[in-house]
């Protein structure tokens, strides 16, 4: 099992809203710290609800498409 803290977040992109679990690595304390890491081009969500109707086990979202992120 991966180490870190699982956080439920809402990610709003240009075309969709995703609500899913994001794993914050142990060396990071905040969601924003993990998302803003330079080498990271995508963020991964698990147990995802897409636009309040569709479900997916996993989604990778290109950071360049993200408009906002909020912890739930």
Region spans (language model):
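Conserved RNA-binding domains used in RNP assembly and mRNA/RNA metabolism
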Residues: 1-72
